[in-house]
Design a protein with these regions (language model features):
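Conserved donor-binding/catalytic core segment of Leloir-type glycosyltransferases
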Residues: 202-208, 212-238, 244-247
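A conserved nucleotide-sugar
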Residues: 224, 241-272
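N-terminal subdomain of nucleotide-sugar transferases
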Residues: 1-43, 115
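Membrane-proximal helix-turn-helix segments that form the acceptor-binding/catalytic region
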Residues: 75-81, 108-115, 145-182
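Short N-terminal targeting/anchoring amphipathic segment
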Residues: 2-6, 81-105, 119-123
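A conserved catalytic-core segment of Leloir-type glycosyltransferases
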Residues: 32-72
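Acceptor-binding helix/loop patch of EC 2.4 sugar-transfer enzymes
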Residues: 42, 122-166
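A short, active-site helix/loop in glycosyltransferases that binds the activated sugar's phosphate group
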Residues: 131, 160-202, 245, 249
Length: 275
C-alpha cells in the first residue's frame, strides 16, 4: 500500500514508518520537526515567523487583520508538495491539528489531504478537543490539566491546551470526525474519552523499533545512573516536578550508589545517545 503519515509527536510516526517499510509498504512522512526534538521528515514543513522581528510582524498582522501568516505559510508549503501527497491508499494524521495551524487553515489542509487520497484515519495523540474536554471536566483523577487546577501553572501557560476548547477547535474536531474512516488512541488518556464513539477503532500503543536498541544485561557494579530527560514546555504536565523531588530523595539517601543525569530540551538524536 501507499501510506501517507501527516505530523509527528515523540517519534511515533517515524517508528511506524520504519515498521511499514519493513512490511513492504510505500510510506511518505510529512510534518514539522516537533519543536526542539527535530525528528527526520521526508517532506519537512518549516514553521516560520516564530521568532525575532518576523514574529512581531505575525502578531501585528493577526491583531489588526486576523490573518495568521504562519499558518498560511504552512499551507503553501503543503500545496507545493502536491505531487508527492496525492494518490495514497491511506492517510493518517497524528492529531486533529497535525501541522499546528489555525483551525481554519487546518481544516483546508485536512480537506486537501482527504480529497487527494483514499482513506483517512486519525490518531488521538497529544492534545485534541475530546481529550482536553474530558480532562477539563475532571473525569480523570489525574490529567495534563491537574497542575493548572492545583495552581502550579497559570492559564497563560496552558493557553495552547485550553485553546482546544474554543469554538473554532471544536468545529474543526467535528468536521474531521465527520470525514475520517476511524480514530485510534495511542494511550489511556485518549482511550477513555473515545470509548463508545462510533468511529473509535481502539487503542494501539506507541510503536517502538526494537532493532535500534541492543538488549544488553544490566550491570550495576558501580554507581546506578538514572537519566531524566525534561521537556521544559511541558514541565508540570509531564510530572517532572514529582520526578525531580523523588530523584533528590534517592540521591541524598544513596550518594555513593546513585548518579542522576538530567537534561532539558535536547534534539532527539542527541537525547537518545546521552545515556
Amino acid at each position: 500500500m501507499k501510506i501517507l503519515l501527516v505530523g509527528e509527536y515523540s517519534r511515533l510516526h517515524n517508528s511506524l514508518k520504519e515498521g511499514l517499510l519493513k512490511l513492504g509498504h510505500q510510506v511518505v512522512l510529512i510534518g514539522l520537526e516537533d519543536g526542539f526534538k527535530k525528528y527526520p521528515m521526508d517532506l519537512l514543513i518549516q514553521k516560520k515567523y516564530d521568532s525575532g522581528f518576523l514574529k512581531k510582524i505575525k502578531i501585528f498582522l493577526y491583531r489588526i487583520f486576523r490573518i495568521d501568516i504562519s499558518s498560511l505559510s504552512i499551507e503553501r508549503q503543503v500545496r507545493k508538495h502536491q505531487k508527492e501527497l496525492t494518490g495514497h491508499d491511506v492517510v493518517q494524521f497524528i492529531n486533529e491539528n497535525a501541522l499546528s495551524c489555525s483551525p481554519k487553515v487546518a481544516k483546508r489542509i485536512f480537506d486537501f489531504f482527504r480529497k487527494e487520497n483514499k482513506k483517512t484515519f486519525l490518531l488521538s495523540c497529544g492534545t485534541d478537543h475530546l481529550s482536553v474536554k474530558y480532562a477539563f471536566e475532571k473525569k480523570l483523577r489525574y490529567s495534563l490539566l491537574t497542575p493548572y487546577f492545583n495552581g502550579k501553572s497559570s492559564k497563560s501557560e496552558n493557553r495552547f491546551v485550553l485553546s482546544y476548547l474554543d469554538r473554532a477547535h471544536e468545529s474543526l474536531h467535528h468536521w474531521i470526525f465527520k470525514h475520517i474512516e476511524g480514530v485510534i488512541a495511542s494511550d489511556l488518556d485518549y482511550h477513555l474519552p473515545l470509548k463508545n464513539h462510533p468511529k473509535y477503532k481502539g487503542c494501539v500503543p506507541n510503536c517502538i523499533n526494537t532493532s535500534l536498541f541492543e538488549a544488553t544485561p544490566l550491570k550495576t557494579a558501580g554507581k546506578i545512573r538514572i537519566f531524566h530527560g525534561i521537556n521544559k514546555e511541558n514541565y508540570y504536565r509531564k510530572g517532572n516536578d514529582f520526578f525531580e523531588k523523588a530523584l533528590a530523595i534517592v540521591e541524598k539517601k544513596y550518594p555513593e550508589r546513585i548518579e542522576v543525569l538530567t537534561v532539558s530540551n535536547l534534539p532527539y538524536d542527541v537525547y537518545i545517545k546521552s545515556y
